[in-house]
């Protein structure tokens, strides 16, 4: 058979195979068009479950007469014009296929009027070439689309339609979902001439809660927690039922991304993990959740019906949802008798993530590390602890910044020689036991902090400082253990039999390190949870290495074992190539001053800079 261009009606019917699955698919596409047109009132009339008639009437902006032919053509849309528009899409529709596809498998009439027109116009596509005829009509500002005899010309598709009751149940559920996505829109649903659903526009919190109750029912409202959390450009809000409000089926699970109805595996996985052990296997969570983020951070053009999306920062979104819901559920504790007991969740995260394209910092995946040991003064209520006289740094002057490039020449390392005995004794002597006088000037190569005191400069190694603080913090809190965080995708790997047995023997120790493993059968282990420190590491390589380390130190006492394992965590968790921002560097300096001021006299931690030769050059040059 030779290659040929398909006739328009056949091409549209093929496209309809993806877009028009059943009558509810038609309702979805047409109502989304109404919402994109700015309608705040949409009426939906259904006859015979949608097989006989689907009529959508709205008060949106309408379509001009000279655009009606295009409206029924394939790949014609007013919603995107360039690739940039597609990458940051805000509308519900964008492909320009729906009307052409629907008209190819039904008898469709499209009647519309804009505010600028004195009369309305009606369009209808007919025949093999799908030619559009236009005639005047009576209609207020807005649009009405009538779809009659769905699948009349595709008997095979019509044969797969279910009963009238089943098809209308799908439409009813769709309208309920739309009602929760747009509280500001009045929705009326009729079936065979009778009003089945009527949702008035809800513009206040009380009205929104009434609509929520109308859609989800009173039992859901009784157990509902209002939750809201925000991190950088990502916001999560909505309602979720406590475990006591769980249901025997998953019929009350609504999620929306930027106002778009969604059934996304990643989102569902994060929600299930948040409930984790709170629900038995035969119970399902109930929730209505809204995720709002930069449209450029989500790709909606990955599913024919737009039910799924692809997040550019998938792990960030997954862990953000998990952390927000996990925190809300644990804060709530037992079920509250008060409906809608609002829980404002503030995630303990580090510096905001910058969009687009920047990978999240490793610290984001859990509580921000505070490596200070719980000092006695702090436990007793002191607000300053041992930080002493340390003052927040002031930014360096322009004159100081100009000279820094020529000043950053460090002395060679002096093996075994105390800093006070080094060649730069005057500078070393200036390093105080209390570093309150030290002033942080700027970052150098995002790995060192330039310090100044009495016109003398020194460099602080931020990696060494953080490793020291982290090691001390881990040892101090070893008995409490590290918090385990679920992996987006569990990691499985094969182990020799002796290490499989070791995992079972050392289960308690591994959990103390924030690692949870379970058997995958026949020499296979599955890693399901890790501490935040190891989130961004090569887990398949590190876990066997860790198990061998534990095995080799099995004869050591508990204290020695803790020191070895804490050092291992530090080395794996803080890479030598780690980069820092100024705020993090300054925090590390504050904690170093408070707990390890003696380390400021260690040339491995702080190196003085040789200024004498530079100053001499300036002097010689007058």
UniProtKB/Swiss-Prot annotation:
- For this UniProt entry, which segments traverse the membrane? none
Among the GO molecular function terms of this UniProt record, one is: ATP hydrolysis activity
Gene Ontology CC: mismatch repair complex
Under SUPFAM superfamilies, the record lists: ATPase domain of HSP90 chaperone/DNA topoisomerase II/histidine kinase, DNA mismatch repair protein MutL, Ribosomal protein S5 domain 2-like
Known PROSITE patterns for this protein? DNA_MISMATCH_REPAIR_1
**SMART domains found in the cross-reference section:** DNA_mis_repair (SM01340), MutL_C (SM00853)
The alphabetized UniProt keywords are: DNA damage, DNA repair
BP term (GO), one = mismatch repair
Protein function: This protein is involved in the repair of mismatches in DNA. It is required for dam-dependent methyl-directed DNA mismatch repair. May act as a 'molecular matchmaker', a protein that promotes the formation of a stable complex between two or more DNA-binding proteins in an ATP-dependent manner without itself being part of a final effector complex.
What protein name does the entry list? DNA mismatch repair protein MutL
């Amino acid at each position: 058979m030779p290659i040929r261009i398909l006739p328009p009606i056949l091409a549209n019917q093929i496209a309809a195979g993806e877009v028009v699955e059943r009558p509810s698919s038609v309702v979805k596409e047409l109502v989304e068009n109404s919402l994109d047109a700015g309608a705040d009132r949409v009426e939906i009339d259904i006859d015979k479950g949608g097989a006989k008639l689907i009529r959508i009437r709205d008060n949106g902006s309408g379509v001009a007469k000279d655009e009606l032919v295009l409206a029924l053509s394939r790949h014609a849309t007013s919603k995107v014009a360039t690739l940039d528009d597609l990458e940051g899409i805000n509308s519900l529709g964008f492909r320009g296929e729906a009307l052409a596809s629907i008209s190819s498998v039904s008898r469709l009439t499209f009647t519309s009027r804009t505010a600028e027109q004195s009369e309305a116009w009606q369009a209808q596509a007919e025949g093999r070439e799908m030619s559009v005829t236009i005639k005047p009509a009576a209609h207020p500002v807005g649009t009405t689309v009538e779809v009659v005899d769905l699948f009349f010309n595709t008997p095979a598709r019509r044969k797969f339609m279910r009963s009238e009751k089943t098809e209308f149940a799908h439409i009813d559920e769709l309208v309920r979902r739309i009602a929760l996505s747009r509280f500001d829109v009045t929705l009326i649903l009729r079936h065979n001439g009778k009003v089945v659903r009527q949702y008035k526009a809800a513009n206040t919190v009380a009205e929104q809660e009434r609509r929520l109750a109308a859609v989800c029912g009173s039992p859901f409202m009784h157990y509902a927690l209002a939750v809201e959390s925000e991190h950088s450009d990502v916001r999560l809000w909505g309602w979720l039922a406590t475990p006591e409000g769980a249901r025997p089926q998953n019929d009350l699970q609504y999620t929306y991304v930027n106002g778009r109805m969604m059934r996304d595996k990643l989102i569902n996985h994060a929600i299930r993990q948040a409930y984790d052990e709170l629900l038995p296997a035969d119970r399902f969570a109930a929730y209505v959740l809204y995720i709002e983020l930069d449209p450029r951070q989500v790709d909606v053009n990955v599913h024919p019906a737009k039910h799924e999306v692809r997040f550019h920062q998938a792990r960030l979104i997954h862990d953000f949802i998990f952390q927000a819901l996990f925190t809300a559920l644990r804060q709530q504790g037992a079920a509250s008798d008060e409906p809608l007991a609002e829980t404002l969740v503030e995630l303990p995260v580090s510096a905001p993530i910058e969009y687009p394209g920047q990978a999240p910092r490793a610290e984001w995946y859990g509580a921000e590390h505070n490596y200070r040991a719980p000092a006695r003064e702090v436990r007793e209520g002191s607000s300053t602890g041992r930080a002493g006289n340390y003052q927040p740094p002031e930014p360096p002057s322009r004159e100081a910044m100009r000279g820094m490039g020529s000043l950053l020449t460090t002395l060679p390392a002096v093996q075994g020689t105390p800093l006070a005995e080094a060649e730069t004794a005057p500078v070393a002597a200036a390093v105080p036991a209390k570093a309150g006088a030290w002033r942080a000037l700027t970052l150098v190569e995002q790995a060192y902090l330039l310090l100044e005191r009495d016109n003398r400069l020194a460099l602080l190694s931020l990696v060494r400082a953080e490793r020291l603080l982290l090691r001390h913090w881990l040892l101090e809190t070893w008995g409490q253990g590290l918090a385990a965080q679920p992996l987006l995708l569990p990691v499985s790997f094969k182990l020799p039999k002796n290490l499989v047995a070791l995992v079972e023997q050392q289960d308690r120790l591994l959990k103390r390190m924030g690692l949870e493993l379970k058997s995958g059968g026949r020499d296979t282990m599955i890693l399901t949870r890790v501490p935040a420190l190891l989130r961004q590491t090569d887990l398949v390589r590190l876990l066997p290495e860790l198990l061998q380390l534990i095995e080799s130190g099995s004869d050591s006492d508990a204290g020695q074992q803790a020191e070895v394992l804490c050092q291992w965590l530090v080395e794996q968790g803080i890479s030598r190539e780690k980069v820092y921002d100024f705020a993090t560097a300054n925090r590390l300096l504050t904690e170093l001053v408070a707990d390890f001021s003696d380390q400021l006299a260690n040339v491995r931690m702080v190196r003085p800079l040789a200024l004498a030769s530079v100053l001499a050059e300036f002097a010689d040059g007058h």
